[in-house]
Amino acid sequence: MCKEIEGQKLFGSAIILAGGRSSRMGFDKQFIEINEKRLIEITAGRLAQIFDEIIIVTNRPEMHSCCQYKLTSDIIKGKGPLGGIHAGLLAAESEFVFAIACDMPYINLDYIEHMKCVVESSIKAGEDIDACITLKGEWIEPFNAFYRKSLVKSIEEHLESDKRAVYSLLKQLNTTYISEFEARRFSPDWSMFFNMNTMEELRQYSQVTQEEKPNGKVEIL
């Protein structure tokens, strides 16, 4: 595990983007339950092993009233994932903030620690880094990634110009990319980037969960 650079709180905050239209799934994915516990809370608990601050970005905070984690909502409404990242960065305390979506059930802590090391190495080398992103071929993986808190202004300007794509923003930034080859050393099947968009994908994940825990079940609220 990498150590923090002296005098700087580089890491410590993680944001989970919850909700969205979920048109292909047919319901709000932030309310999926696995083994009688919300998937988003399972994700938060896993991340809490290596982060001091967990922030859930949700458009329905009243549905998380019993949640032990910090809640926030989009400041700039209706802008998709980038609006959620913006809200999470505003609420976060650390300089670099880990971001993941609520429908990504496979949390790879070893890879997160590896990304921290990549960020630290870049800083120690004197590089100005705004984000640490994984590539799959020529495509980017915008989640399971780190973003710098100071990007808030850049994101606001990007959204104000009616641009919502994370990729178009990253092209303007000092982005450090991790290759697919390197990332697959930690997740050969790419499961750490798997997200559930359809009922079939939910059933597949349910089946895996039930195989791991015979009494496992998936519930949709």
Curated annotation (Swiss-Prot):
Any GO MF annotation of the entry: GTP binding
Species lineage: Bacteria, Bacillati, Bacillota, Clostridia, Peptostreptococcales
Alphabetical list of Gene3D superfamilies matching this protein: Spore Coat Polysaccharide Biosynthesis Protein SpsA, Chain A
Cofactor: Mg(2+)
EC number per UniProt: 2.7.7.77
Database matches in InterPro entries: MobA-like_NTP_Trfase (IPR025877), Molybde_CF_guanTrfase (IPR013482), Nucleotide-diphossugar_trans (IPR029044)
Described purpose of this protein according to its UniProt entry: Transfers a GMP moiety from GTP to Mo-molybdopterin (Mo-MPT) cofactor (Moco or molybdenum cofactor) to form Mo-molybdopterin guanine dinucleotide (Mo-MGD) cofactor.
Lineage: superkingdom: Bacteria
Pfam family, one: NTP_transf_3
Record bears the keyword GTP-binding: yes
Binding site for Mg(2+): D103
Domain topic, free-text comment: The N-terminal domain determines nucleotide recognition and specific binding, while the C-terminal domain determines the specific binding to the target protein.
Catalytic activity: Mo-molybdopterin + GTP + H(+) = Mo-molybdopterin guanine dinucleotide + diphosphate
Binding residue positions for GTP: L17, A18, G19, K29, D74, D103
Family stated for the protein in its record: Belongs to the MobA family.
Disulfides per UniProt: none
KW Magnesium (keyword) present: yes
Compartment(s) where it occurs, according to its Swiss-Prot or TrEMBL record: Cytoplasm
Name the record gives this protein: Probable molybdenum cofactor guanylyltransferase
Gene this chain is encoded by: mobA
Enzyme class: transferase
GO cellular component, one term: cytoplasm
GO biological process, one term: Mo-molybdopterin cofactor biosynthetic process
Principal location: cytoplasm
